[in-house]
């Protein structure tokens, strides 16, 4: 199965760098437009059986960069992270792999869950230090 990385809110220059860096890994890159933020992420990734939302998104959305991955192994995730660091894109804190649970979520639901997980992780790290 083909790996797909969906990029949210990346500038054209940062997206160009990412595409170039991921080309040797044969990872397909897709830019998700704001008008698609209400679509199920499984639909955006081309997962069979996931129906599209009827309307285009016209709300405020979110501005944070996010990468959503489909058909990735742990090794492929590591390769993606290394490639993005090497090409100058750098660290992208909000990353997710599509799961059977999240494939029906829209992008707003996903980013809310990611932010909550990220905050929880930061709290745990502060407690340890």
Residue ranges and their predicted role:
Residues 20-24, 35, 60, 122-129:
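An N-terminus-focused feature that recognizes amino-terminal "leader" regions
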Residues 58-87:
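Mid-chain, well-packed structural core segment of small domains
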Residues 10-11, 35-37, 73, 99-103:
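Short beta-alpha junction loops
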Residues 1-48:
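N-terminal, charge-rich interaction modules
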């Amino acid at each position: 199965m083909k790996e797909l990385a969906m990029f949210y809110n990346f500038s054209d220059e940062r997206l160009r760098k990412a595409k170039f860096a991921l080309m040797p890994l044969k990872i397909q890159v897709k830019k998700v437009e704001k008008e698609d933020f209400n679509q199920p992420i499984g639909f955006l990734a081309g997962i069979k059986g996931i129906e599209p939302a009827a309307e285009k998104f016209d709300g405020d959305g979110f501005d944070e960069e996010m990468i959503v991955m489909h058909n990735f192994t742990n090794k492929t995730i590591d390769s993606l992270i290394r490639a993005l660091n090497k090409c100058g894109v750098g660290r992208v804190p909000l990353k997710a792999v599509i799961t059977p649970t999240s494939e029906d979520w829209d992008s707003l639901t996903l980013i809310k869950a990611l932010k909550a997980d990220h905050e929880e992780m930061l709290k745990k790290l502060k407690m340890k230090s």
